[in-house]
A protein has these predicted regions:
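Hydrophobic alpha-helical transmembrane segments
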Residues: 1-70, 111-224
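Basic, amphipathic juxtamembrane/active-site segments
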Residues: 73, 84-130
Length: 224
């Protein structure tokens, strides 16, 4: 990963002491940012497995699985934070860094959103699998529009309301709420299913918004 500052997602957590310490520790141990990016996919697979296990479990086992999914989502985001810090702040970026920065992110998005959808569907909300796929496609579309802009010589546009941090925050919250509220106050899978609809709507709005902003940047100002 060798992005210039204007092409990096603005994150306040990048200045957090723990993030700086972890990035420095990884750099000292010779861990490449590409390996950190790849690790995010491993955590996404963990999250997918946790959602599917939760669909088969009841009681405390389901609670543990859902909380495990929430933890996996957050660890995926930690990897997304640290890969860039190791690459940029510690000068360990590689020529293939941009590839590792983007592709694992898209794979992780699909694994987590589709996993949540199938988990909710197996729990009894049949249409949730389709909601998961729709959310995943729209999530990838938001990144496509951003990278399209960069390919056209424009700065990366990370505007929301359904950018990656927003999507993962909603999905994490849904997993935690489901763990707490099911089955007494919420039918199993129902919260995840409707949450995926929300994520799809937010991602769709984001794709449209980024497209309009890109078109505006590419359109020359009219002559007075």
């Amino acid at each position: 990963m060798n992005d210039t500052p204007e092409n990096r997602r603005p994150l306040k957590s990048r200045d957090a002491g723990w993030a700086r310490a972890w990035a420095a520790a990884l750099a000292r141990r010779g861990v490449s940012p590409d390996a950190v990016s790849a690790a995010s996919v491993a955590f996404a697979i963990w999250g997918l497995a946790a959602f599917l296990c939760a669909a088969r479990f009841e009681g405390i086992s389901r609670v543990v699985a859902l909380l495990g999914a929430a933890l996996a989502i957050q660890l995926r985001l930690v990897c997304n934070l640290l890969d860039g810090m190791v690459a940029v702040e510690h000068g360990r970026g590689s020529p293939t860094g941009p590839v590792w920065n983007e592709l694992p992110d898209r794979v992780a998005d699909v694994l987590l959103l589709v996993g949540a959808g199938y988990g909710a569907a197996i729990s009894g909300v049949g249409w949730a699998s389709a909601a998961g796929w729709i959310a995943a496609v729209l999530a990838v579309l938001t990144a496509y529009v951003r990278e399209l802009g960069r390919g056209l010589g424009q700065p990366a546009d990370f505007v929301g309301p359904g950018a990656k941090p927003h999507r993962m925050a909603v999905l994490t919250l849904l997993a935690v709420v489901s763990a707490i509220a099911e089955p007494r106050w919420l039918a199993p899978g129902r919260g995840l299913a409707w949450g995926l609809i929300l994520i799809a709507v937010l991602a769709g709005l984001t794709a449209v918004r980024r497209t309009l902003r890109l078109a505006a940047r590419l359109t020359p100002p009219s002559a007075e």
